[in-house]
Structure formats: C-alpha cells, structure tokens
Amino acid sequence: MADPGLRSGVGLPSQQGQKHDLQKDQKQPHVNNADRTTQSLLNSYIYDYLIKKDYCEAARAFGREAQVQTLVRSQEETNSLAKRHKRMSPVAVKHEGISNNESSDENMNVNNGNLDSFSSSSAPPPPPILPIDSAGGFLIEWWNVFWDIYNARRGQGSEPAKAYMSHISNLRKKSRLNLQEIQKNSLHTGNTSHPYANASFPHDPANAMGQQIDSSQFHQGAGGLNDRNQHLMRQAMLNNQSRETFPPTAAQLQQLKQLHYRQLQSVQQQQKQHQQKKTPQSGSTPQMQNTTSQPTTHDTHPPKQQGPISDFRSIPSSPKTEGAPSNAQFRPSLPATPNGSVPQSNPLYDTTGLNGGQYPVVQNSAQPLLHEINFASNRNPHLKQGGAVPSSTLPQQQKSLDKPKPAQQPSTGQFSGNQMNQYGFSNSPYSQNMLYNFNGNANPSRLNPALKNYMEELKLLEQQNKKRLLLVSQEKERKGYTSASPDRPLSQTITESSVAKTKSTTPKSTDTPTEATTSPVKVSTKNSNTTENLNGINESNMPMLQNGLPLRTSGDHPSNYSNLIENSSTSDTNNADNGMDVMGNWQLQQTHSSRPTPNASSPLDVRSKQKPSSANSNAPTPAPTVNTTNPESSTNEATSVGPALEPSQGANVHKSDSELDNQNQSGKSNPDTSATPSAPTESTTVATKSSDNQLLDVGNSTDIDAALLNDFDFDKFLKDTSTGDDLWFGLFNLPDNEDSTAA
C-alpha cells in the first residue's frame, strides 16, 4: 500500500499541496504513521463505496478533499470507460498501481492525468488502491454482517447469525467456569490441579513473545502482601467475574496466574511461621500430648491428670486405637479442687476411647441432669431436707472412695454416679459403683451387687406382704373379731406362750355341747336383716358405740393396728362413757340364736379343719375363739364380744338362749345403754353346742402381733451388714411365724 504522503490521485498544484499538508500536520501533530495508514485505508474504502454505489459527484468531491490514492489510467481507457461505464478488475488495479519509489516528476504527471479524470463529468472517477476488494464493496459487506450479528443478540436476524451467537455464548460460559475454578483454587492452599493454574497458554502473547515475570516481584508481593491487599484482590476478581468477556485476554490470564502464585507464596509462608511457633511449644508440653494419645485398656487405670483442664462437659474426640473399648463411658471433665490439685480420675470417666458418633456431646451445660439430681437426693436424705451434709459422714464416704477397686471392663453406655461431685452433692457409698444402662439392656448380671440384693429384698418383701394380707383377711373372716383401738397402748402382760396357746386352741364342731372358753360376755344383737361388710359380719352383730354408731371392724383399720389388743382387767364401769376405750375389749363369739349367719357359707373355698377349744386361760387371748351352737339351725349365729377374764374371775355362769333374747330386747328398748358396752361385773360363760359350721384352716397364719414385733430387728433393717452404713434398707427376711399358729 502506498504511503499517504504520495497523493497520486489529487490534481492540485505542488505549492497548494504543500500548504495543505502543512495545515493538516498542524491540526494533527501527534498522529503517527500507523494511524495515518489506517485513516488513509478507511478513506479509500469510503471512496470505493461511493463509486460502487454510483455516487460519482460525491466520490469526486470526497476524493478531492480526502486525497484518496487512485489508479493511473490512459486517455483512451478513460474515454472507453466513460462510454461503457465499466469498472476495472482488482488485478488490473494492482498492476496499474504506482510504486512508492517513483520520482516526484512522474507522480506529478500521474496527478495531472488523474486531475483531468476527476474533473471530467462524463467518465466515472478512477478506482482507489485497496488491499481487499469485493464486487459489492467491502464496507457495505462488513456493515451487513455487523448489523445481522447485532440483531441476533436480541433474538432477531438470520439463522446463521443466531447459531453463531449461541456458539459464542456457550464459549463464554465455559470461559466463566474456568475463571471461577481458577479463583477457587487460588483461595485454597496448595491446590494447583487446574490446568489454567500451571499450564502455559499457547495463545498467550506473553508466552509467545518470551515475556516472563520477574521473580523478584513475586518475592516482594509474597512478603509485602497483607490481608487487606488479598481481600481487595479477591474482591476485584469477583467484580471482574460478572463481566461477560470472552475469551479471557492475555492480561487477565496473566493477572490470574500472578494472583494465584502470590497466594500460594503467602500461604506457604504462613504455614512455615505456624510450624516455627509450634516447635518451641511442643517440647514444653509433652505430658499433655501423652495424656491425649494414651490408649485405654481394660485392666489399667489412667494416670492422674495434670495441667489445665478443659471446660465443663467438653469431651475431646480422639480416633480409635487398638485395645480401646468400642463403647466408652460418657463423662465430663473432673473439676479442680480449691488447693489446685486435680482429684484422681475414675476409670469410668476415661474419654480417650470415646466413640465420637455414638453419644451426643452436650456442651456449655451448667445445670445437671434431672435424673442425676433425683438420684442424689434419693440416696442422701439430707439433700431432701435442704440441709447440709453432716461432717461425720464425710470421712466414712471418703474412706469408701479411697478403697482400691478391681479393674472393671466397661460396658455399653455406662454412666457413673460419682458425677454428682461436680454439682456440690455428697458422694453416697451406694452411688460409687452405680452403673446405668443407657441402651435399655436390663441385664441383672451387670447390676451392682448391692442394688441387686436390694431389688431381690423388695420383691421378697412384697410377696410376703401380699401373703400376710391374704392370710390375715381370711383369718379375720373366720374369727370375726374387731381390731383394737390404735389409741390404746399394747399390754405388757401378753406373753408368747399365752398367744401361741390361744391361737392353737379352737373348738371342735360336734353334735354335743363342748366346754367353752370362760369369758365375761356383753352381747349386742339386732333382729333386723342387714348387709354384710368386707369381713362377712353383719352390722347388726357389731358392737355399738355410745352415740349409736357401730364399731369399725378390723378391715377398716390399718393392718399395723390389728395387733394392738390390750388386757381390760383394770377397766371399770366408767368405760361406758368412752366408747373408743372399749373397742379393744370385744371378742367375736357365736351363740345360740335363730338369726342367719353369714359365716356359715364362706365365699372362700378352702379346706376346713376342726380345732379343739382351750380351757380357762390365765392371760387374755388376742386371737378370738368361735363357738357354734344350735344344731337345729346351723346357719344362725350371733356375735358376742367381751374382754378377757382375770384369774380372780373364775365363776362359770351358763347363759341360755332365752337370756340372750331378753338381753337383745333390752338393748333395743334402751339404745343408750346397750349400744355402749360396759365393763362386766361378774364372770359368765356361754354354753355352746356343736353345729355344722366349719372353720377355715389356713396354715402359717401371720397376725402382725407382739410376737412379730419382738422378732423384728430394726437395727438390722437400718444397717448394711457388709459396710455398716445407713442405706435405707437392710438385708433382712421377715419371719413367717410358723410357730404362731399350730397346724
């Protein structure tokens, strides 16, 4: 392409051309040769566009003003073109071009010839000198392509343009993803796996031109790059990421590589500094490292902990080691004592073999668990009362804690009761070895021996209580006596021999009258038919109080008051004023009567047995005796209750059926005197007859009486024979009192 300084196509005089060049140079003093070439090339294409669109006048004016370089044609050719209006081919243009090495005289001749062609209106303007020529014009073709692509970005345009834009958008997405991966890898330490981070780019102008980054700049950037600069660089990367630039330019790629290299250098330097800081500290604390790395075995206790202790309930998780149990115990760290020493750790508290995924770790919990507080309060009665633990129990408990214990193999989910210490609760000797089974495997073999004994004793005691309640209820239904008043004290004159003798003597059921037990009798009966109570006794046959209310039966009283039967030898006639004092002086006795007896048909189907009655006894009998009368009507009975006889009252008086009826009528006419029984003034006996009523024979009768209270050992109940401590229960077995009732 010719130099724009050689204006071959302009027919201006030499002086005018020099002046014009000087003026143009003054207007554009800083334009270099490359810019002049680009501007001259654009003017040539504009001139070519005007000629091919047949804008001849505009082309002549523009060529004259812009000094466009044109081809040199002869006069004949100019005339022929004027006639035919044909254009020359691009090959002819190249061959007819004027060389830059031609002399100025020849150029002037050419310019003069071209001036005639510009001035002639008949011939078309001469064609410009172009490197690339096209039939329709290069400028118009470029414009059509640009406009089609521009419309394709908005969804319009031709199909080829749309396909081209979709392909370009996919390439941009891939380029964006690559940039994101480079950014992520640069933020992480030592991750240079991405190809853009290490590989050299073949199309990178920096690599093609052999440009390399000075290593001193990297060292300076790694040393002087602070956190703020790194943050700014990362923010710049994020901002540049939003821009849709494809493909990434060489400057961007080089910037990414520099940033990544600087970050790697800074990270490596930080790691070296961190290792240097760790090196002097590692030698000062070898004991703590040994403590955390020591594996837990089944038959060895961990050593005493030294050094600082972690926060409450912070359990460090460590990997499993050989010999460590698969399911370790859950414990918080031990608190330090006021004098600065650390108490000896319990082997159940070892956390080096803790399975990190088995139990959830509760952190920053300042309150104890609810079941732990309840357990400690149940074990220690002083905590229930809200008082302080007496100091006398502390040495004994400390003694029990200091005892050496055999190695225990940890079981699944065990939890130690010694954890109460860190909440301020006192250690009970029973909670030292208490183990909880968190997984719900209620295996008795894994329980503590003391707890196992306690559970067995509770079961045994419950069975014995049920058995005693059943036997007492059956015997009360058979004998039909009322319980003594709980307000009156137990008589000291009752002896074991008299009690056993009285219980072992029962009357035989025969057809002939037998000898009855001598006792003063006070009978209170009614002829009306009433309902039975729980003991099978008619309310009409029950003794009456002074206010007309019947006395409560033994079933209405608590079971522990059924043995309070007292001798009434010292009672006098003033007992009628206090009905509660006479409650313990009654005994149930069957007499000859025509009223139906509910005890004749007992609801309990048990084996009955006849027992002989006893003679006059020197001591009062707490167990009542039942005598059957009236063989003609075996289902009738009347209850008579009276106190036991004194030795001085030995007279036997037989009371017939008519006397009982008269007494019953008198009791109806005067309810105030008959309802409240008075003390007997003379000894009477009741002549009994045999009947078909069968007595209940229950073996091993266990009345809770004085014999049971005498045999019961309270000291053994409140003490543990193995340790001698107060455990709220004892290793005891209640006696069955087999000798209390004769077979």
From Swiss-Prot:
Tell me which domain of life the UniProt entry assigns to the organism this sequence originates from. Answer: Eukaryota
- Keyword Glycoprotein part of the UniProt annotation: no
Renumbered to this chain, the Polar residues biased-composition regions fall at 98-114, 282-297, 315-353, 390-399, 408-426, 482-500, 521-544, 556-566, 586-602, 661-670
As stated in the Swiss-Prot or TrEMBL entry, residues carrying the post-translational modification Phosphoserine are S89
Q: Composition bias, kind Basic and acidic residues: at what positions?
A: 18-28
Record keywords: Transcription regulation included? Answer: yes
Localization recorded for this chain is: Cytoplasm; Nucleus
Give the main location. Answer: cytoplasm
Cellular component, GO, one term? cytoplasm
Q: Which Pfam families match?
A: LisH, SSDP
| Protein name per Swiss-Prot or TrEMBL | Adhesion defective protein 2
